[in-house]
Amino acid sequence: THKQFPNYKRYEIEYEGRPLVMETGKLAELCNSAVLVSYGETTVLVTCTASARPKDGVDYFPLSVDFNEKLYAVGRIPGSFNRREGRPSLNAVLASRLIDRPMRPLFPSDLRNDVIIACEVLSVDRDCSPEITAMIGASAAVSISDVPFNGPIAGIVLGWDGEKYLFNPTQEQRKTNRMITTIAATHKKIVMIESEADQVPDDVM
């Protein structure tokens, strides 16, 4: 592997009881950077591509985050007449925003180059969130690229079942949770909190 891919690197840690593996230097080498992230059985390929020159006539940062979750990732065939994938699902759109929201403020405010972060979900383990996997991969991909970025960030899902907190809860645990909160942070501060919950005490929140 090292002879065929001299830039290949692999890192593995345990993240809330499950293996988190990041690999780079093997896929999508024409992008500014690419990271293959696996969390449990969930695998996401995240690529970062930036234009060489600033975009003319814009007064904002043209960042685009695309989260693509195809049916093959869960072992299914599209049920439409022509067996083709449809438009991005609501979940995919929300996942794209979930990744965009904590990362966008960490780029320089005067950056005007087009930057596209593409998260391609290759396989899904329903107990290991593809959204969190993609968020970690997106942060890693931008961090190792030549795009200026004041990261990295990490994300975690925090659940509460009425008695105790659960970190990155499984799909079964989520069904009974009274609160599901997604948190993204740098090593210094929290940059995003998104929550859906029943009525819960203030001290729990």
What kind of feature is each model-predicted range?
Residues 32-116, 121-123, 128:
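Glycine-rich, flexible beta-strand/loop modules in the N-terminal catalytic cores of phosphate-handling
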Residues 146-205:
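Mobile "lid/hinge" segments at catalytic clefts and subdomain interfaces of large enzymes
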Residues 3, 11-12, 19, 57, ...:
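Catalytic cores of large soluble enzymes that bind and process phosphate-bearing ligands
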Residues 13, 23-26, 35-39, 44-52, ...:
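Short beta-strand elements
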Residues 1-29, 34-35:
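Short, Gly/Pro- and small/polar-rich lid/capping loops
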Residues 24-25, 32-34, 48-50, 56-59, ...:
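Short acidic, glycine/serine/threonine-rich loops at helix termini
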Residues 102, 133-145:
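Stable alpha-helical structural segments in soluble proteins, enriched in small hydrophobic residues
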